[in-house]
Regions:
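Conserved beta-strand segments of alpha/beta enzyme cores
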Residues: 7-9, 58, 77, 108
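Active-site substrate-recognition segment that forms the wall
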Residues: 67-75, 83-182
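Dinucleotide-binding Rossmann-like beta1-alpha1 core, especially the glycine-rich loop
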Residues: 1-13
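Helical element adjacent to the flavin cofactor pocket in flavoenzyme catalytic cores
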Residues: 23-89
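A conserved beta-strand/loop capping segment in the N-terminal third of enzymes
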Residues: 1, 19-25
Length: 182
């Protein structure tokens, strides 16, 4: 990180614990990246939804895009399971399904679907004030408002929605080694 110019501060175990009062942290030390940040996906999506609606946009839930009326480079309408939707602009926000959803348009979306695994504690006994990476366990820990998310492992699997119990168990097993109170 230092070679790349990323700001960092090595921490003793005591300094790591001092960043998160009330949390029992078992560590040999840490590294603080003061410019790191994190967000709560539900809060972000709620804010984006509100901004779209304030700006006069329209959001349609439970509607599938089935094709496009798009002669040449002009998009006249999105064909959906609820009928055609015409507009001056469109936002395609289908995540991993965006390449499939955009079929028929003259766009190339170089995306690869993948899935990560996470466990969210709804009411942790104590809350972290900064995010953490449990390097040896390969688990990221992110405070999200009143919840705490432990996430690890990323699989590049295409649109396979199956869940590996082994990967989930690996995350669960790692938590008490670093945070005994969880």
């Amino acid at each position: 990180a230092e070679r790349l110019g990323v700001a960092l501060e090595p921490l003793t175990p005591e300094q790591a614990r001092a960043l998160n009062p009330g949390v029992d942290i078992q560590c040999a030390g840490g590294v603080l990246f003061p410019l790191d940040c994190f967000l709560s996906p539900p809060r972000l999506l709620a804010a984006l939804r509100a901004a779209i609606l304030r700006g006069g946009g329209e959001i349609r839930n439970g509607v599938e895009v089935t094709g496009w009326d798009a002669p040449g480079d002009d998009v006249r309408a999105a064909k959906t399971s609820a009928g055609d939707v015409s507009g001056a602009q469109y936002v395609l926000a289908a995540g991993s399904w965006s390449p499939r959803t955009s079929a028929g348009l003259r766009v190339r979306l170089p995306m690869q679907a993948g899935k990560g695994y996470s466990i969210t504690l709804e009411q942790p006994p104590a809350q972290l004030s900064v995010c953490a990476i449990l390097t040896e366990a390969r688990v990221a820990v992110t405070p999200m408002g009143e919840t705490l998310r432990f996430g690890g492992t990323m699989e590049v699997t295409g649109l396979d929605e199956s869940v590996s119990a082994r990967r989930v168990a690996g995350i669960i097993k790692s938590i008490p080694r670093y945070f005994p109170q969880y």
